[in-house]
């Protein structure tokens, strides 16, 4: 009787572990977006006009994502010594449900962007992250599609 009870408890524990794994598989694993990402290209589509920016020349942009927050930093590669000097930074918390990624921009050097939520669809394929969604801020007359293509920054250790 004692052996039957122990066998039953062991069976329940094993099945519980298996069920948890199956539930994770059924729900789908979270996309592996955590890490540091370097922006390769940014495409803005606004009022029928498309602007593609190459972030591998003359400027650089990175996004850092941990388990609850994101931050971005961008600057020109001429160290601010020409007419195209640039620095921008921002960040906040985010949520991720399947491929639906929402950023809440709490901090930004362009303060009028603060406090806004931006909804994106994200895809990760190997070391590439593609983020696509609408940026809309009525008070600034911003209403555009933004498509960003990132590559994961490898550790240099």
Protein language model annotation of sequence segments:
Residues 4-14:
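Sec-dependent N-terminal signal peptides
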Residues 17-89, 102-157:
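Lipid interaction determinants
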């Amino acid at each position: 009787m004692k052996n039957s009870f122990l066998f039953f408890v062991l069976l329940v524990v094993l099945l519980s572990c298996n069920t948890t794994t199956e539930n994770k598989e059924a729900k789908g694993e979270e996309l592996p977006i955590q890490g540091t990402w370097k922006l390769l290209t940014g495409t803005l589509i606004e009022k029928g006009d498309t602007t593609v920016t190459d972030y591998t020349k003359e400027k650089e942009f990175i996004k850092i994502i941990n388990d609850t927050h994101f931050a971005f930093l961008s600057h020109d590669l001429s160290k601010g010594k020409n007419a195209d000097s640039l620095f921008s930074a921002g960040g906040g918390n985010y949520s991720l449900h399947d491929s639906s990624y929402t950023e809440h921009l709490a901090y930004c050097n362009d303060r009028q962007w603060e406090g806004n939520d931006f909804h994106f669809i994200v895809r990760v394929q190997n070391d590439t992250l593609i983020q696509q969604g609408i940026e809309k801020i009525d008070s600034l007359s911003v209403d555009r599609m933004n498509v960003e293509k990132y590559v994961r920054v490898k550790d240099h250790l």
